[in-house]
UniProtKB/Swiss-Prot annotation:
This is Chaperone protein DnaJ. Zn(2+) 2 binds at residues 169, 172, 191, 194. It comes from the Bacteria. The lineage of its organism: Bacteria, Pseudomonadati, Pseudomonadota, Betaproteobacteria, Burkholderiales. The gene is dnaJ. PROSITE patterns: DNAJ_1 (PS00636), DNAJ_2 (PS50076), ZF_CR (PS51188). Participates actively in the response to hyperosmotic and heat shock by preventing the aggregation of stress-denatured proteins and by disaggregating proteins, also in an autonomous, DnaK-independent fashion. Unfolded proteins bind initially to DnaJ; upon interaction with the DnaJ-bound protein, DnaK hydrolyzes its bound ATP, resulting in the formation of a stable complex. GrpE releases ADP from DnaK; ATP binding to DnaK triggers the release of the substrate protein, thus completing the reaction cycle.
């Protein structure tokens, strides 16, 4: 039987963003979670839950998603070295502690730790960093302040009020999970009493409220690679929120936001700028200087240059993070009309205008076509 399209499984279009995919998965996971579907409909919900989990695992991974978009299910076939493959109830139980574990009695993030206490991966953090075009092109090293969680100095990480002890959970007997029977099957779920920790704190620490950790801030060195573009993300492994019960910490994602530049606009590896020239230079030609990220460059303006003319400077753009060569710089010509003319200047321009008209020659590439259109319009 052919597998259902992963995008159809989650109910999202093929151009869906990572956030849209995550939201769709959360919605389906909560709808079909075993805790909410028991009895006759449990098997159907179980299958839908597993389908949603498999689709999310594929589409939330950039490399797997790219392979799937290009080759379909064959690109992520486990027999070819990728994909999730078929799962027994071990993988199904593992999914219980996924990204929505907090909804069903766990912590953020998640994995499941065998037959012992539930362990959960910490949540990911995001940080928006603004960089200038010059910094994006050349790369930079920066320091950022991010939240960190350290052992509470009062209870030393136990979560219990000094002088009191942590008790073993009487519901799961310290395992962090309880067994739930569904027909012939037995499925593990997070203990609702201790939320998977396997322990209870009768007298929580007043400083950390029983968490065992306090929130602080730390300075992190970040290397911005040369050529990075707006919207790209840098992953800092292990600098997210802490895990629970010995689980690994989450990651920090630094999202790059490119500041608006006074001169250039970026389009991939190419740069664009508007270059104003006088109408005398446009008519007679000449050499002008144009700005580049590396300094000044010269452009020869041929006589008769029209507004909107585009000049290309090869290799004067940006070398992207995945590019072998830098892009180009495109200079778009605008012709400026002089203002605040003196009487003498006005007289000279009028003489020039009359001289051109008397000559009878067409001095604009669009003039002949425009004149013919006017004659046809007025029936001349």
């Amino acid at each position: 039987m052919a597998k259902k399209d992963y995008y159809d499984t989650l109910g999202v279009p093929k151009n869906a963003s990572d956030e849209d995919i995550k939201k769709a998965y959360r919605k389906l996971a909560m709808k079909h979670h075993p805790d909410r579907n028991q009895g006759d409909t449990s098997k159907v919900s179980e299958d839908k839950f597993k389908e949603a989990k498999e689709a999310y695992e594929m589409l939330s991974d950039a490399q797997k998603r790219a392979a799937y978009d290009q080759y379909g299910h064959a690109g992520v076939d486990p027999n070819r070295g990728g994909g999730p493959g078929a799962e027994g109830f071990g993988g199904f139980a593992e999914a219980f502690g996924d990204i929505f574990g907090d909804v069903f009695g766990g912590q953020r993030g998640g994995a499941q730790g065998g037959g012992g206490r539930q362990v959960y991966r910490g949540g990911d953090l995001s940080y928006a960093m603004e960089v200038t075009l010059e910094e994006a092109a050349a790369g930079k090293e920066a320091q950022i302040r991010i939240p960190s969680w350290d052992d509470c100095g009062i209870c030393h990480g136990t979560g219990a009020k000094p002088g009191t002890k942590v008790a073993t959970c009487t519901t799961c007997h310290g395992h962090g999970v309880v067994q739930m029977r569904q027909g012939f099957f037995s499925v593990q779920q997070t203990c609702p009493q201790c939320k998977g920790s396997g322990k209870l704190i009768p007298s929580p620490c007043v400083a950390c409220h029983g968490v065992g950790k306090t929130k602080n801030n730390k300075t992190l060195e970040v290397k911005i690679p040369a050529g990075i573009d707006d919207g790209m993300r840098i992953r800092s492994t292990g600098n997210g929120e802490p895990g629970t019960n010995g689980g690994p910490p989450g990651d920090l994602y630094i999202e790059i936001r490119l500041k608006k530049h006074d001169i250039f606009e970026r389009d991939g590896d190419d740069l664009h700028c508007s270059m104003p020239i006088s109408f005398m230079t446009a008519a007679l030609g000449g050499e002008i200087e144009v700005p580049t990220l590396a300094g000044k460059a010269a452009i020869d303006i041929p006589e008769g240059t029209q507004a909107g003319k585009q000049f290309r400077l090869r290799g004067k753009g940006i070398k992207g993070v995945r590019s072998s060569y830098p892009g180009d710089l495109y200079c778009h010509i605008t012709v400026e009309t002089p203002v605040k003319l003196t009487e003498h200047q006005r007289k000279l321009l009028k003489e020039l205008d009359e001289s051109i008209k008397k000559g009878g020659a067409k001095h604009s590439p669009s003039e002949e076509g425009w004149t013919d259109k006017l004659k046809n319009f007025f029936g001349a």
